[in-house]
């Protein structure tokens, strides 16, 4: 079924349509942005008024949601070929492509000035960099090169840095360490996704790591990047973003995740990759809990 055919379906209810508009923003990804940007605000030195902090986080989430909507618009034909994504609002014909495009363009027009006013111009500039990198570089690059993994990790790691700069007004070692942590975490996380969704990505014509380099090589890179995550997560201690209790928890969690990654190097099939993907989510959740509880 083509997208044009799907668009001819009956108009959904107002509630369903509102839900579909929200789905364009990819709520799970936007939710992670809310948590990490709020985390950057909370961990940064100094005090930020609650109203200002809330507006900063909401404006950040709005920019990221708009980037996701533009990604959905650009990849609607690809999504229609993939089982995991073919029921998304655009390939299923429940939302008109021009609506998604309009939201993706107009929301940042309002959200970026809000960030500049309630936070500072530096934070708004970081949001703009994340938007452009995700939409104009990462999204088209997914069909051409496995380097899209590294490029896509940049906008994914910027939200906690935005939270930090919103509180401090500057780029410094503490904020960059938070950026490095989220950047490093995404590598084994999405490499695992490329294994257990390999067939679906192949249907979509996306050049993910497991398709180009093979599953065994991908598993080896999962182990290597999971191991690299351990020292990166510990950088927050000498930089005095977090205390020794966080360091102890981060070391245990990191070694456990890396051990699980190395145990999967010689395995076959997608089950382990799916379990490792879930393990990375648990790891990040527990790490942020420890980070908040062990902050200096």
UniProtKB/Swiss-Prot annotation:
Q: Which PROSITE patterns match?
A: UBIA
What's the catalysed reaction?
heme b + (2E,6E)-farnesyl diphosphate + H2O = Fe(II)-heme o + diphosphate
Q: Where in the cell is it found?
A: Cell inner membrane
Which terms are listed as keywords in the entry?
A: Cell inner membrane, Cell membrane, Heme biosynthesis, Membrane, Transferase, Transmembrane, Transmembrane helix
Query: Can you cite an annotated GO cellular component?
Result: plasma membrane
* EC number of the protein: 2.5.1.141
- Give the highest taxon in the source lineage: Bacteria
Pathway note: Porphyrin-containing compound metabolism; heme O biosynthesis; heme O from protoheme: step 1/1
Principal localisation:
membrane
Q: Name one GO molecular function term.
A: protoheme IX farnesyltransferase activity
**What's a single GO BP term from this record?**
heme O biosynthetic process
Q: Which CDD domains match?
A: PT_UbiA_Cox10
Q: What EC class is this? A: transferase
Its UniProt miscellaneous note says: Carbon 2 of the heme B porphyrin ring is defined according to the Fischer nomenclature.
**Similarity-based family:** Belongs to the UbiA prenyltransferase family. Protoheme IX farnesyltransferase subfamily.
The protein's role, per its UniProt record? Converts heme B (protoheme IX) to heme O by substitution of the vinyl group on carbon 2 of heme B porphyrin ring with a hydroxyethyl farnesyl side group.
- Matching HAMAP family: CyoE_CtaB
Specify the protein name. Answer: Protoheme IX farnesyltransferase
Gene of this entry: ctaB
């Amino acid at each position: 079924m083509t997208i044009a055919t799907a668009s001819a379906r009956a108009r959904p209810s107002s509630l369903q349509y509102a839900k579909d508009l929200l789905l364009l923003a990819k709520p799970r990804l936007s939710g992670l942005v809310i948590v990490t940007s709020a985390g950057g605000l909370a961990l940064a030195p100094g005090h930020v008024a609650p109203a200002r902090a809330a507006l900063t986080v909401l404006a950040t989430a709005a920019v990221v949601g708009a980037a996701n909507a533009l990604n959905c618009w650009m990849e609607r034909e690809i999504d229609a070929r993939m089982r995991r994504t073919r029921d998304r609002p655009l390939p299923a014909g429940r939302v008109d492509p021009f609506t998604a495009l309009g939201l993706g363009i107009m929301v940042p027009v309002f959200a970026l000035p809000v960030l500049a006013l309630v936070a500072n111009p530096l934070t708004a500039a970081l949001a703009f960099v994340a938007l452009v990198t995700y939409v104009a570089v990462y999204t088209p690059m997914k069909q051409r090169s496995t380097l899209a993994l590294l490029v896509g990790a940049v906008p994914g790691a910027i939200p906690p840095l935005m939270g930090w700069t919103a509180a401090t007004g500057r780029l410094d070692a503490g904020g960059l360490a938070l950026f490095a942590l989220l950047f490093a975490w995404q590598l084994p996380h999405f490499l695992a996704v490329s294994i257990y969704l390999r067939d679906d990505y192949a249907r979509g014509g996306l050049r993910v790591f497991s398709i180009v380099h093979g599953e065994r090589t991908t598993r080896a890179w999962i182990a290597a990047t999971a191991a690299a995550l351990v020292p990166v997560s510990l950088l927050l201690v000498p930089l005095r973003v977090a205390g020794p209790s966080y360091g102890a928890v981060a070391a245990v969690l990191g070694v456990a995740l890396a051990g699980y990654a190395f145990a999967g190097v010689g395995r076959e099939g997608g089950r382990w990759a799916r379990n490792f993907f879930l393990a990375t989510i648990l790891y990040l959740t527990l790490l942020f809990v420890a980070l908040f509880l062990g902050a200096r």
